[in-house]
Every structure is written in structure tokens, then in C-alpha cells.
């Protein structure tokens, strides 16, 4: 989907804003300074190449990226390698896994000078200096409007609806143990059903639920709305923003998000403890909060910028709302029970 408004926004922002923020270091030319910033991300990270090139030109640093996997894999790898860090800075730790990373002292404290006021609402409970919120979105079930119209079937609305016989063999989600959207969906079911969440998953399973490894598998392989993929599932786990990327020439979207099924996801970045280039890592964090990057996030990563002063693409206003009342689970409960919930899910749902 073309987003001309976003392109114009990015161009304007590039013309008038420093990409590395007010705290950017002098160009890294000294022999004693590292000249590479190693960035560790999840495998859905993407930004406009022109922005990355501009960061390198302005700071003198060379960016080097690695992506161990999805959000859950990213955090696991950061923990396993914390004594010999994979990089200098990491992006893509979400609120489901943040407590685990903080408990393992993976990150060093750093608060960007230009942290937007709106970011305060997404600070990690109890330790906002180690992780900086970068973007936010809602993980929700999505539906293929055309499929339901063709089959003369009402679209589901709630989590309960997904267990009804009318929707047997129609739903696909990603694995909570391997995928951050999958984990967000697990948390949504815990927030909605409390201690009955396992029974809910068992009803889903009995109704033909399909579980795959990653969000990419869900959306680009199994979802019927994916172009040319031959998917067979018209109900798929994705984001509330996904319908903004399936807009037709007449301005309508072929898909929709079920806003009563959503769990709020916040993605963070942080300077890795023991980083070889902490100054470069800090500069990259400042860069992620700069206006050009925040404006680029919607079109590249399906997420809302954490800076609420950034203008959104017009398509998002019409087709990509955040849920007015997302399902929630207290952060303290996630931190205390996440491993237990995942073990229970593995034992009683997957078997």
C-alpha cells in the first residue's frame, strides 16, 4: 500500500530535524573510539535506508544489524549472551518480555534527553531508565472481509466467538513461546478469562485452532487475505494497524481488526550492559526517537510511534485505530507468572 503522506512527512522531517537527537556525540573518528554500532533487533525491524544512511553520515558511526529471531527469541538470546553481549543496543523487547530482561540485568541505564512526554505512559514499571519505549500497537485478531462476504457468514467480534462451531477451522495464531504477538494473544486470554484461560484455549483447540511459529507465517502464509499465498484461514492474529496495509483503490480495506480481542504491545530499546560502544548505542536510541524515525515507524513496522505529536498517515486514521479498551494484565503479574503460564500452555494446550 502506498503511503504518500508518510513519504512527505519523512522528507519534511529529514530536512528540519537532527536524526541523532540533541545528545548525539561528535563524529567517531578517533582511533580510541569504536566506529561501529552493533544493533540487535527482532526479525520484523525495518526502517527507511535513507534514514539509516543519514544517521551514519551525521554521527560517523557504521551500523551493523543482527536479528536472532522474533521478540521472544531476541530476549532469550540477549539473556544467554549477557556476559558477552551480541551488540551495543537492542530494539524490539516488548512489555511481555521486558521484566525478564530487566531481572537479568541485560540493559544499562540511559534516558534520552529528547524523550517525548507521551512516552511516560509506556515506561516500564519500576525501571524506566533501562528501557526506552519506541513504539506501541495492539495485537488483535484480524478478519478477511471478502472471505466472510463470499461465504455469507457474519464476522466474529469477541474472543468467545472464535470458539463457536460457525468458525471451526478458521483461526490461526502464532506460538506464544516463540512469537511476541503470540504471547500477547496468550496474555489477552489470561486478562479476559483469568484462571479459566486454559479452558478457553482447549475450546479453541477443539474448534480447529491452528498454531504456527511466527507472525509472518500467520499473516503471509495462512491468512486468506495474504496476496497469492493460498491461505485457508480468514481469522488471523496480527495488529490493529494491519488493515491500513490492505486498502484497495476505492479506499476501503479488505481486512479488519477485532478491537474487542486486543492486547496493548509496547516495544522498547536499550543500551546493552557491557556494550563495546555505549556512546554509539545512546546515539542510536536518540535516533529512534527522532521525528523522522518516529514518522517512518507506521509504514515500516505496523506500529504507532510513541511520540503522539507525530502526524499519522491518513490511511491509519480511517483503518488503523488503537483499541479503545484493550485487554490488560498487570505488569507485575506478567513478571511473576510468565514462565509458569508458558509451561502450562505447553503442557495443557500443546500437550
Map each language-model feature to its residues.
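Periplasmic-binding protein-like
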Residues: 167-177, 287-312
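A structural signal for short loop-to-beta-strand junctions that line the ligand-binding cleft
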Residues: 85-90, 108-145, 160, 170-176
Amino acid at each position: 500500500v502506498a503511503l504518500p503522506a508518510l513519504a512527505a512527512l519523512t522528507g519534511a522531517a529529514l530536512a528540519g530535524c537532527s536524526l541523532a537527537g540533541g545528545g548525539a556525540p561528535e563524529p567517531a573518528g578517533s582511533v580510541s573510539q569504536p566506529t561501529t554500532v552493533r544493533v540487535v533487533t527482532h526479525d520484523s525491524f525495518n526502517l527507511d535506508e535513507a534514514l539509516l544512511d543519514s544517521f551514519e553520515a551525521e554521527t560517523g558511526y557504521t551500523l551493523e544489524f543482527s536479528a536472532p529471531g522474533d521478540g521472544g527469541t531476541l530476549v532469550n538470546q540477549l539473556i544467554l549472551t549477557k556476559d558477552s553481549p551480541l551488540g551495543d543496543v537492542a530494539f524490539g523487547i516488548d512489555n511481555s518480555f521486558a521484566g525478564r530482561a530487566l531481572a537479568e540485568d541485560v540493559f544499562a541505564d540511559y534516558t534520552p534527553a529528547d524523550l517525548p512526554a507521551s512516552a511516560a505512559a509506556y515506561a516500564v514499571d519500576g525501571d524506566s531508565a533501562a528501557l526506552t519505549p519506541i513504539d506501541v500497537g495492539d495485537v488483535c485478531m484480524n478478519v478477511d472481509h471478502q472471505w466472510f462476504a463470499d461465504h455469507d457468514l457474519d464476522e466474529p467480534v469477541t474472543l468467545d466467538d472464535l470458539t463457536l462451531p460457525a468458525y471451526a477451522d478458521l483461526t490461526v495464531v502464532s506460538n506464544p513461546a516463540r512469537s511476541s504477538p503470540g504471547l500477547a494473544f496468550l496474555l489477552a486470554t489470561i486478562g479476559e478469562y483469568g484462571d479459566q484461560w486454559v479452558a478457553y484455549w482447549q475450546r479453541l483447540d477443539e474448534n480447529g485452532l491452528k498454531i504456527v511459529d511466527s507472525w509472518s507465517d500467520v499473516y503471509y502464509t495462512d491468512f486468506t487475505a495474504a496476496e497469492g499465498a493460498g491461505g485457508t484461514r480468514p481469522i488471523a492474529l496480527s495488529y490493529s494497524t494491519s488493515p491500513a496495509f490492505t486498502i484497495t483503490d476505492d479506499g476501503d480495506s479488505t481486512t479488519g481488526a477485532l478491537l474487542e480481542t486486543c492486547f496493548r504491545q509496547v516495544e522498547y530499546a536499550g543500551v546493552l550492559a557491557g556494550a563495546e560502544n555505549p556512546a554509539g548505542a545512546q546515539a542510536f536510541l536518540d535516533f529512534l526517537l527522532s521525528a523522522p524515525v518516529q514518522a517512518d515507524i507506521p509504514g515500516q513496522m505496523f506500529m504507532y510511534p510513541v511520540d503522539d505529536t507525530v502526524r499519522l498517515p491518513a490511511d491509519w486514521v480511517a483503518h488503523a485505530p488503537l483499541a479503545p479498551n484493550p485487554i490488560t494484565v498487570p505488569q507485575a503479574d506478567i513478571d511473576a507468572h510468565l514462565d509458569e503460564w508458558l509451561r502450562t500452555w505447553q503442557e495443557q494446550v500443546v500437550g
